[in-house]
Design a protein with these regions (language model features):
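N-terminal nucleophile
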Residues: 1-322
Length: 322
């Protein structure tokens, strides 16, 4: 969660401060988190007035883990809109004026998108295509579809995944993307002795990731396949080749997946594969293990002229027996 909070406070990403603006010129953020040990999940969608939506999602998960109340009320796992904002205040989470989340850069992007959309609508011979795809293209051109995601494993072998996003630029108010949807934005199952653990998060055009439930698809594949094959098949067959996206011309998506195959003592004496893949032009990844002196950063980029629309890369760690 701390990683997501850091990037939500960083105005160059599309999460928290600096998020894409809605048609109304406001910020509405989505976020979710999943704990691989308990398999609990917490999410918020179309949330206004909160600097760090992932903290609200984490609190939702925390309350869910407490179970039903004395009256038998089932705690929510997903809150949206004004209800999510009120719930956050009731639980002591920090709120802020909506204007605090808007930056000069996000305003300029919004103005550019509005002008282009109005120009497109007034054209006599406009090419018929999905309006959503137009918005996704505009977001990608402005390098502003930077969904924030994180996957991690602690020293006990417990895995967790989280994701946060401001959504596509010029989205309809109330629109919710994959970052808040179960199985689409993040997924995690914890490592047990002699078992496989997986944590996964996604990025890209939310509607497409929701239709394909990409986080769950890739994580499920990784339980029986190596991490590279899981991401290749997930993004290739289950995303680019999905029948649910057959009418979509430009399928924008990315996956970050952590796969752990352990010995008899969980996080001790295990192999950790960190793999990322994307169909977008680029994807930025940072990672660090306990034995590393400092984080490593990689800007993965599909070169111009590359015929394969999908790029998959990764790294491997071997955690010794303690």
């Amino acid at each position: 969660m701390c990683v997501c909070v850091f990037f939500q406070d960083f105005p160059c990403t599309n999460a928290g401060i600096g998020s894409n603006l809605t048609k109304s010129g406001t910020v509405e953020c989505d976020a979710s988190i999943m704990d691989g040990q308990s398999l609990t999940f917490g999410a918020v969608g179309a949330l206004k007035g909160v600097r760090n939506p992932i903290q609200v999602a984490s609190k939702v998960l925390e309350e869910e883990m407490k179970g039903s109340s004395t009256l038998g009320l089932i705690p929510p796992i997903f809150l949206a809109g004004e209800g999510a904002f009120q719930w956050a205040m009731e639980h002591g989470l920090t709120t802020c004026p909506d204007g605090d989340l808007i930056t000069e850069r996000s305003t300029q992007t919004w103005q550019k998108c509005k002008a282009r959309l109005q120009s497109s609508q007034s054209a006599v011979h406009e090419h018929k295509r999905c309006r959503l795809e137009n918005l996704c293209d505009l977001s990608n051109e402005d390098d502003n579809m930077d969904t924030v995601g994180a996957v991690c494993m602690d020293t006990h072998g417990h895995l967790c995944a989280g994701v946060s996003s401001g959504g596509v630029v010029y989205k309809t108010p109330g629109r919710i993307g994959q970052a808040a949807v179960y199985g689409s934005g993040c997924w995690a199952t914890t490592l047990e002795a002699n078992q496989v653990g997986v944590a996964c998060c996604t990025s890209g055009c939310g509607e497409y990731l929701i239709k394909t439930m990409l986080a769950n698809e890739c994580a499920t594949l990784a339980l029986t396949k190596d991490a590279v094959s899981a991401v290749q098949q997930g993004l290739g067959d289950r995303f680019l080749g999905s029948t649910f996206l057959s009418s979509v011309e430009k399928k924008l998506g990315g996956v970050l997946l952590l796969r752990v195959e352990g010995g008899a003592e969980g996080a001790n004496d295990c192999t950790v594969d960190l793999v990322w893949g994307h169909t977008t032009q680029s994807m930025c990844i940072g990672y660090m293990a306990e034995q590393d002196e400092k984080p490593k950063v990689r800007l993965s980029r599909i070169e111009k002229g590359q015929q394969d629309p999908l790029l998959v890369e990764g790294t491997v760690y071997r955690l010794p027996h303690r």
